[in-house]
Curated annotation (Swiss-Prot):
Mn(2+) 2 binds at residues 211-212. Mn(2+) 1 binds at residues 211, 328, 387. It holds the Pfam family SpoIIE. Changing residue 600 to E: Does not affect ATPase activity. Abolishes autophosphorylation. It comes from Mycobacterium tuberculosis (strain ATCC 25618 / H37Rv). Induction: Induced by heat stress. The lineage of its organism: Bacteria, Bacillati, Actinomycetota, Actinomycetes, Mycobacteriales. Optimum temperature is 37 degrees Celsius for phosphatase activity. GO terms for molecular function: alkaline phosphatase activity; ATP binding; identical protein binding; magnesium ion binding; manganese ion binding; phosphatase activity; protein serine/threonine kinase activity; protein serine/threonine phosphatase activity. This is Multidomain regulatory protein Rv1364c. Changing residue 448 to K: Abolishes autophosphorylation. SMART domains: PP2C_SIG.
Amino acid sequence: MAAEMDWDKTVGAAEDVRRIFEHIPAILVGLEGPDHRFVAVNAAYRGFSPLLDTVGQPAREVYPELEGQQIYEMLDRVYQTGEPQSGSEWRLQTDYDGSGVEERYFDFVVTPRRRADGSIEGVQLIVDDVTSRVRARQAAEARVEELSERYRNVRDSATVMQQALLAASVPVVPGADIAAEYLVAAEDTAAGGDWFDALALGDRLVLVVGDVVGHGVEAAAVMSQLRTALRMQISAGYTVVEALEAVDRFHKQVPGSKSATMCVGSLDFTSGEFQYCTAGHPPPLLVTADASARYVEPTGAGPLGSGTGFPVRSEVLNIGDAILFYTDGLIERPGRPLEASTAEFADLAASIASGSGGFVLDAPARPIDRLCSDTLELLLRSTGYNDDVTLLAMQRRAPTPPLHITLDATINAARTVRAQLREWLAEIGADHSDIADIVHAISEFVENAVEHGYATDVSKGIVVAAALAGDGNVRASVIDRGQWKDHRDGARGRGRGLAMAEALVSEARIMHGAGGTTATLTHRLSRPARFVTDTMVRRAAFQQTIDSEFVSLVESGRIVVRGDVDSTTAATLDRQIAVESRSGIAPVTIDLSAVTHLGSAGVGALAAACDRARKQGTECVLVAPPGSPAHHVLSLVQLPVVGADTEDIFAQE
């Protein structure tokens, strides 16, 4: 019988060991049993959670908000299997100190703790709070986003190539919300064989996910040809079966395309019928409105060249039901048996849909975006991934009713329309860039109706209407009952507004008649797909809290502007610029970062200020971050604009 260990001699005196454990600067935690009850914590942990009395408490009771963020699942695996686990820069949201839920990032190692007989009694964690490091990197990445397009394209050449071959966006349609994410496994295999598509065809929506055997440029070339061939067939109105049969015939002309797999589904907007074919591809995951998840039945079709034909099956999707298409990289993950991995995917998606899983802080407004992004991050961060991953998700929704506004033809009409139009466009799911473009164009139409159509204020003189069609296009109109009156030529800024409106949207027309003027626009809506090389990477998109009230703050050589700069406020800005710059003699910087709308009148004032500075040999610097409404408009009219902190970025680089 082995001699009992002399703990004092081998490990150290108990009091010394406890004191050393207490003063180690890393967070150390000991948990016991299947419920992971706290049995030991050191000073670093208590300093991190000073108000929580944890010893003796189960971890799930101490941090209930972590349920569904995959941390407890990891502790369970270590306790059950004895295999250590680790995480790098895991994002976790919970109440750490009794002050409310907050988001922090951690590196950690979880290892089993065994009894003398070898059985596992608990787990222990070594944890490092790396929140400051992650946020500093994220801030640097956000600043880099403000560099020139040339610099970004060089830095992200692999992603740019992927976006050139794949669908860069998904449509916005009245009967469904759509989201897509493409996760690149590694930089040197960025040109892979996965692809996705979403086609809005008026009465139906077609979703496609496919996978070509292999990686690299050859697989990407094959993928691109198959994607184009299938897209042409679907766009021509052929059924799912007919389109797949045509691509199966075509694949014989494309070396390397045999055994490519596809999953194609078609949603009828009216009935909710979802017809699909799994051509050698994993079946979609259906997450119902009540947050239950199941895989739909495979249809029995094989990959291209298999000769099995392309039978289809149907499901009826109710309002709130979501369907998730994916490639095998999502379920064939390192260290996970396929059966366990597919079950984990379904369970996680269901918990996120129910609200019990996933992240709660800064969550996307649309449930489908949260389902996509949280599923990828939480599913893959515990195992990693060694293949590209595509996730295309769609949730059926009730269509938003068309917009109809009747308002008085007054100088404030455009401001009233902008507020209601922004709200309606956000409700139908439009991206912020499309919202800015449409709001700008309609605002110009309304201002022209007031200025050119009526000599005085007219009650209910303007009608604005907008609707989203099943082909993904917004069609909007501004109608007045006045008689069009041209202004004299040569007036500063005249004629710029309608030209800007036409440039911002897909199509714009103005028709004058005896009964008034009708201005119409058609604009195709889309939302960008997300292309990343790391589930933790979240590109900084321009985010702006809408406060359209015009405010300008003037300090030495600098004017900071917030809100809408339109025909009613541009004159104020023009005067402030003239005074601060002494009519162009003194240099001036105009910060437009918080501008919510920059109309043609505002552009005219800024153009005049730049022209005065040029003639006087001084500078008028316009500042607006890329993605902001002001940056978008100024780039369109080719007025020089710089992003915030651009000079500091170049100095750092």
